[in-house]
Amino acid sequence: MIFSVNARYTSWAGFFYSVFLGMAVALLLGYLYAKILNHLKLNEEIVGTFAGYSFIPVMNLFYTFAPVTNRQMLYPIGGQGLRPKVNLEPYFGQVLDRLWQVRIGELVIPAGLLLFFFGTGFLLWLFSKTRAGMIFSAIAENERFVRLAGINVNGYRTAAIIMSTVIAAAGVVVYSQSYGILHLYDGPFMMSFPAVSAIVIGGASPRKATVANALIGTFLYQTTYLLSIPVANALLIPEMAEIMRTIITSGIILYAFIFERKDMRNEAH
């Protein structure tokens, strides 16, 4: 997205340029990430968390010295280093949200964004029914059994991690265009926690996560968030909203992992 905005690409040209360039970079980074996870098996949760936290300072250095010439992206004083937030409205901000909008009174339904979301989910569901998708699921359930069947487990793990990284790269572009702002530096620091909370509350586990888990979890999480924050503002001081959001997000993750461990112990007995 940085290079798209720097080149001043607008509308769909900027959006697709950002998506395809991001996916190309994600191919390489996903491969390197897969090598790390394959080398450190059974510690994926810890390794994934700290790998993400470690990569943010690396990107902060890039943002500071990035060869960008678009003055709207740079600090006004000195002209060196990207701003923490870059406005996408003059470029491709909400280009997907405005596609085929449906207006019902004051309610605006972003039909284009919803179709893109459900279309992506449908393609992932179709992929899960293919041979490769079934092998992915089998590896998550019982890696030793799949290896005994003569399947290259590390190869399929690498492919799955690369695919997830590529999809995430496209997802960040969709999220940013919908939000209208590109967040840099420490902006992505806590970005993964709401997503993890949503899919966990939707019924996902470390062994299995489906498109339905993501859909149900997003609805439940957003409903919980929307209902709890106004109550917190009414009962407490308004400044507590962000604190309550963090408590709710972290609490959902902790709750899910506690019951996941209980289920695993019950299966063992």
What residue spans do the PLM features occupy?
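Membrane-water interface segments at the C-terminal ends of transmembrane alpha-helices
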Residues: 4-8, 42-71, 256
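Alpha-helical transmembrane segments within multi-pass membrane transporters and channels
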Residues: 10-54, 221
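Transmembrane alpha-helical segments in multi-pass inner-membrane proteins
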Residues: 20-22, 168, 178-246
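Membrane-interface helix caps of multi-pass small-molecule transporters
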Residues: 31, 35-40, 62-65, 125-126, ...
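Hydrophobic core segments of alpha-helical transmembrane domains in multi-pass membrane transport
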Residues: 53-60, 113-124, 164-172, 198-202, ...
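Transmembrane helix-bundle core of multi-pass membrane transporters
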Residues: 55-128, 236-241, 269
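Helix-loop-helix "hairpin" substructures at the membrane interface of multi-pass membrane proteins
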Residues: 103-183
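Cytosolic-side transmembrane-helix boundaries in multi-pass membrane proteins
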Residues: 141-155, 226-269
